[in-house]
Amino acid sequence: MARGEKGRGEGPAKSALRKVRTATLVINLARGWQQWANENSTRQAQEPTGWMPGGARESDQPSGPVIHPTTHQKVQSAPKSPSPKPGGYGAGQSSEGATEVSPIKRKEVTKTIVSKAYERGGDVSHLSHRYEKDGDEPEPEQPESDIDRLLRSHGSPTRRRKCANLVSELTKGWKEMEQEEQEELKCRSDSIDTEDSGYGGETEERPEQDGEQVAIARIKRPLPSQANRFTEKLNCKAQRKYSQVGHLKGRWQQWADEHIQSQKLNPFSDEFDYELAMSTRLHKGDEGYGRPKEGTRTAERAKRAEEHIYREIMDMCFIIRTMAHPRRDGKIQVTFGDLFDRYVRISDKVVGILMRARKHGLVDFEGEMLWQGRDDHVVITLLK
């Protein structure tokens, strides 16, 4: 009974102590947040004001920063009545809280302000309007503006876009000029034919009209010389020859033609042409007979398999070289049974590799085929 009463007496005391600790923790946390809010508001008030829309109209007003009292400052400015704190927390604790460092971590963040698309619209339109002109340099007496610096710099996206458009227009203009020249020659030949036939109409007004047409044509575009025409033709041919789009289109067309031709020769395809396959197949003795077509995946797999088999042949020759001492003539001889017992631990293709090595002239043995158990006494000679 005494232990139960003692436990009941300690329960309220522990709960009261827990409440006091919780209240203390909340008070310290609130004090830290209040200190951080005060420091943040003071820092923001001391920082210079940034750019705001309509800054030209606001320049007439005094440039001093306007500080609006926050809710935290209003609460602090109001008179506070001292309230009793449990656990003996009085003015001493408040003085200690003022001197202690705020537990809230702060980190400086640098933010770059980038103008929006609608804000850059005016500059882009001004740049495009200026570039559409003849591209005159600014007058020497005028100071160089930001627009001139953008136009002179190589990193201007507007300038790159305009240059690309200008190049594309020039390439299109070459073809149009050729067509116009052909049309003019055709019209002149037709007019000469009509004059010779006598159905040209009034002969007095025609020379004046022809002169006006020639003048208008000269105002639009001067007549090119023979050298200029030759240069333009070369440029047009070069553009047609080295055009990226045309080159890509030609490559796709070439691939499509090759695919159609290969499907006609493929016996597993629905488009297989038996007569074409029989007429184009290789016969014994022709170059490439019995081998896959160069550049295909079958040829790549065959090359990898050949390299793998060659490595295994070299490994077998090395094993034979380590099994016995060379004779006086420099050749090494081992029996098939001993070689089989040694090499079977490395690979199970003992007979196949031996046959391949004999084909390449690296080893020699009697008989066309070797059988384990029956041909264990057969001597295998390493030639190289």
UniProtKB/Swiss-Prot annotation:
Biased composition (Acidic residues): 134-145
Biased composition regions of type Basic and acidic residues, renumbered to the chain: 1-11
GO molecular function: actin binding
Sequence segments annotated as region (Disordered): 1-20, 32-159, 181-211
Source superkingdom: Eukaryota
Family matches, as Pfam families: Costars (PF14705)
Keywords associated with the record: Actin-binding, Activator, Cytoplasm, Cytoskeleton, Phosphoprotein, Protein transport, Transcription, Transcription regulation, Translocation, Transport
Protein name: Actin-binding Rho-activating protein
